[in-house]
Amino acid sequence: MAVPKKKTSKSRRNMRRSHLALGKVNVIVDSQTGEYKLPHHVSLVDGTYNNRQVVTKKIETEEEVA
C-alpha cells in the first residue's frame, strides 16, 4: 500500500484544490417575464426563446392527476 514519505503542506494541498472552486453562474433577467434565466436557454416560466414561443405547456386535467 502506498504511503506518503512526507506530510503535504497546507500550501501545496490548497494549490492542488484550487481547480475545484465553483465559478459563478451567469444569469440574466428575462425581458418578458422579469424572471431569472440562463442566457441562450428557453425560459422555464413561459417557454419562450428569443421572443418566440417554442415550448407549449401541457395542461393537466383532474383525470390525469388522479
Curated annotation (Swiss-Prot):
A cellular component term, taken from the record's GO annotations: large ribosomal subunit
Source superkingdom: Bacteria
A GO term for molecular function: structural constituent of ribosome
GO terms of biological process kind: translation
Alphabetized HAMAP family for the sequence: Ribosomal_bL32
PANTHER family assigned to the protein according to its UniProt record, in alphabetical order: 50S RIBOSOMAL PROTEIN L32, LARGE RIBOSOMAL SUBUNIT PROTEIN BL32
NCBIfam families associated with the record: rpmF_bact
Name of this chain's protein: Large ribosomal subunit protein bL32
Species name: Rickettsia felis (strain ATCC VR-1525 / URRWXCal2)
